[in-house]
């Protein structure tokens, strides 16, 4: 219980720090796909010791299937997250992340057949009630009019994809362990974000952006990578 509580606390702190760094990067007009690719690349490099000691041929197909699907959802989710941060305010976008547990619970019931406890249901009710007071401070109020805002829409897209990703990540953990799950999460996130980034690399402006901002990238994106080191350990929170 103590380790779980510490991991959740670290998850909350690291996620907040990551959002701040990502916001700084988008302020420099750096492409969201590039931000996420470098993040996943940094994490994959951190996983090299695990990769060297891993015998991949022994893994069942369930691990590969869930890891690939999780990588696809993660690449899309994190890219939408950065787009949301580019257009919105952290004070408004942050509380939306609380809904991730709600969405993850729904997909957990469908894909993992997990039934939430009474405590979990009470927590979800508190999340919804709390978000009412946050969004009620906006001009649109707590209503579907909020979805007309681009930043809110992007944040909900990110929430849905990362919540689905969390279910796939948990499946990988169930078939292996946290270290293997983290390795696959980082690697396939890098692969699929790289695929999304490829069309942009044909643009000379994008290439010039990478070259001219490389110092800023490495002083801001590496911290983003490090703050994500705790994410897969508590994917569903």
Locate the predicted segments by residue.
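Hydrophobic/small/kink-forming positions within alpha-helical transmembrane segments
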Residues: 16, 71, 75, 102-106, ...
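Hydrophobic/aromatic residues within transmembrane alpha-helices
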Residues: 25, 35, 84, 110-112, ...
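Conserved small/polar residues in nucleotide/adenosyl-binding loops
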Residues: 227-233
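Glycine-/small-residue-enriched transmembrane alpha-helix faces in small-molecule transporters
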Residues: 1-33, 144-180, 187-188
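Hydrophobic transmembrane alpha-helices of multi-pass small-molecule transport proteins
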Residues: 42, 47, 106-109, 119-138
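Structural signature of hydrophobic alpha-helical transmembrane segments
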Residues: 2-13, 60-73, 118-128, 180-188
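C-terminal ends of transmembrane helices
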Residues: 18-28, 75-92, 134-143, 196-206
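Residue-level signature of transmembrane alpha-helical cores of multipass secondary-active transporters
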Residues: 7-8, 66-67, 82, 124, ...
């Amino acid at each position: 219980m103590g380790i779980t509580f510490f991991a959740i606390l670290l998850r909350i702190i690291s996620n907040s720090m990551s959002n701040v760094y990502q916001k700084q990067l988008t302020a420099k007009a750096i492409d969201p796909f590039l931000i996420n690719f470098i993040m996943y690349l940094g994490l994959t490099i951190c996983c090299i010791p695990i990769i060297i000691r891993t015998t991949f041929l022994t893994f069942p197909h369930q691990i590969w299937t869930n890891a690939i699907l999780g990588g696809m959802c993660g690449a899309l989710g994190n890219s939408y997250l950065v787009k949301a941060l580019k257009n919105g305010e952290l004070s408004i976008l942050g509380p939306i992340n609380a809904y991730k547990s709600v969405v993850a619970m729904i997909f957990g019931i469908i894909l993992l057949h997990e039934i939430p406890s009474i405590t979990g249901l009470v927590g979800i009710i508190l999340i919804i009630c709390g978000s009412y007071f946050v969004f009620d401070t906006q001009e649109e109020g707590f209503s579907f009019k909020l979805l007309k805002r681009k930043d809110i829409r992007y944040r909900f897209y990110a929430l849905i994809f990362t919540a689905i990703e969390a279910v796939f990540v948990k499946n990988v953990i169930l078939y292996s362990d946290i270290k293997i799950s983290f390795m696959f999460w980082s690697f396939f996130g890098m692969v699929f974000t790289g695929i999304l980034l490829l069309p942009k690399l044909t643009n000379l402006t994008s290439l010039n952006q990478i070259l001219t901002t490389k110092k800023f990238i490495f002083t801001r994106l590496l911290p983003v990578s490090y703050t994500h080191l705790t994410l897969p350990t508590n994917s569903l929170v």
